[in-house]
Amino acid sequence: MKKILLTVSLGLALSACATQGTVDKDAQITQDWSVEKLYAEAQDELNSSNYTRAVKLYEILESRFPTSRHARQSQLDTAYAYYKDDEKDKALAAIERFRRLHPQHPNMDYALYLRGLVLFNEDQSFLNKLASQDWSDRDPKANREAYQAFAELVQRFPNSKYAADATARMVKLVDALGGNEMSVARYYMKRGAYIAAANRAQKIIGSYQNTRYVEESLAILELAYQKLGKPQLAADTRRVLETNFPKSPFLTHAWQPDDMPWWRYWH
């Protein structure tokens, strides 16, 4: 047992030495480089998708030239490198560090935009990849956080070159948030929890009026009222459905769980 432990310890020590050796090698190679050369080399690595190497060079640059404009830009570029390398948590941490250190930086609009992108592009679920359905299957927390990041960008920097794309992504995220609520409403209807389903449907109608889920929400709300023994409310809801969606299929047949795609049952 002692021999095994010694072998494991030796292996870990050698691994640590190898990592330290790589860092020391980078430091040694670049020791006489100017800030411009360091930054250019880091950019070359970034553009070549060598993200780990790029981050190392950005860190060396920042440690040697902490007050330079290249150091500040390197902090943003580090966040971007992490984003491209699918290191979401590290990217978000780098962005927050930049925002904390440089709240008035002229590239703050980009920092907000990048934060939104990191959250917006969070990995989709297995069902999303399998069925290629809408984003309502994503984590609603990620949807809200991405929306808030883009909204802050648009509000603070309406003339930013990133504002138009951020706005377009916000539209998609609002639709996704409505879809999150719809998924829950469908689930409650299937389980016979009609009060909870009605509350979710009302939330969609009130908060997500410009999404594609309003029509189905009205159909669910009408049926929920019927099941709850509230015929007047059901009739009122049906009139709203008729007025706003005169060609709705829910006018000829009530909402049914069978109307849902197969993968909705997996929620």
Swiss-Prot record:
Lipid attachment points (S-diacylglycerol cysteine): C17
UniProt keyword Membrane, yes or no: yes
Subcellular location, record wording: Cell outer membrane
Keywords: Cell outer membrane, Competence, Lipoprotein, Membrane, Palmitate, Signal
Annotated family: Belongs to the BamD family.
Alphabetical list of HAMAP family matching this protein: OM_assembly_BamD (MF_00922)
Function: Part of the outer membrane protein assembly complex, which is involved in assembly and insertion of beta-barrel proteins into the outer membrane. Required for efficient transformation of Neisseria meningitidis by species-related DNA.
Subunit: Part of the Bam complex.
Protein name (database record): Outer membrane protein assembly factor BamD
Species, as recorded: Neisseria meningitidis serogroup A / serotype 4A (strain DSM 15465 / Z2491)
